[in-house]
Amino acid sequence: MSHFGDHVGIDPAIMKQYSEHHNGSHDNDDKDKEDKEKQNTEAVAAAAVQLDASLLASGILDDFEKAKKEEEEANGNNNASNDQQNASDRHVGDMLEQHSQQHQQSQEHDTSYINTYIEDKVPLTSVLIPGDRRVSDREASDRIAATTRRVRLRWTQEETADLMEGCKVHGVGNWKKILTDPRFRFNNRTAVDLKDRFRTCFPEDYRRLYPNARSRKFGKKTNVMAVNDDLVKVNRKERRVFTPEEDERLLNGFMKHGPSWSNIQRDNELGLFERRSTDLRDRFRNAFPLEYAAAGFKARGPKRRPVVEATHGNTLQTIFSASDGSEMSPRKYHRVQEQMDRQPVMRVHPQAPMDQGVDRDHMTQQFTQELQPQAHSRKQQGGDGLKEEVFAAAQNQSYNNYYYQK
């Protein structure tokens, strides 16, 4: 440092004073560091003493030292057998588990410090501390579900008889009352089980009482064991035509609930609960097609009827058109146009009522009589005219059957 002061021209006394101060500051830093380490060591020792005091007060430390001493003596004895060693290990584990449970019940000490101290001195093995493995929530729920899952039991004749008697007393549908009635005995059943059993034994009555239920189709094989011969089979409900009053109530229900057929069927003011929701929908579509289409549903289109005229020069778009004015598709137009180019259109009176349709048999007979002289003359000329005319007649008749339908 003095050489550096001489080189730069600094007073040696000042450099000496600076050097003493600099070395003293380093000594002070080292001293502070040693003091802090000493304080930390004393704090750790005090915490260990306090922890040992708490363990000693609870009795765990003495028992642990005693168990450890017994374990060392057992390990030092070379003549001891493996059975004695295992017994000693189990004894130590039982003692530790017992004291751990006692300490958890008391609220005087912190359990986390004790567990940390034990983990530092005792290896955590399955022999010393059995059953210490944590179980996940999913595994616990699976165990609970496995123990609480019910075993399905076959219905007996006594249970089925009690179910029938309960339906007579409380009525069909009051499954909770039937289940809780002390007069009837059921083997670990629920209200849903009673309902399912009734549906199995009486499928027709179930469909009548629950018209909107989507139940599976029952096969030919039935459970004969549970059904008694004394049961009275209810006659199936016959189909009834909708009356004008029902149509009016159906229209009012549509104005009130919209296209919600289930709500219309359950509305007590309308009185349509005897009808199914699908029946109400189909009836409304047929009776009120305009309102049905206005609601956004696809109504059934009008049937195509021929507009017949007696001339051959009319186009197909004029002869065959829908009542709503829509034209024929181009594909059908070209197919029929080719047939009309080969054969004339059937002669149908233009004033014939469309509701009566067309007498196809009479028209075919008349058409055949007109073709016979022409075919006979062509046959005499040596040509195959009869075969051609018969084929044309059959083709024209198929054309008539396809387009001239009622």
From Swiss-Prot:
Feature: compositional bias, Basic and acidic residues: 20-40
GO molecular function annotation: DNA binding
SMART domains attached to this UniProt entry: SANT
Keyword Oxidoreductase: no
Repeat among keywords: no
SUPFAM superfamilies per record: Homeodomain-like (SSF46689)
Residue stretches making up the HTH myb-type domain: 147-206
Annotated Myb-like domain residues: 234-288
Protein name: telomere-associated protein 1
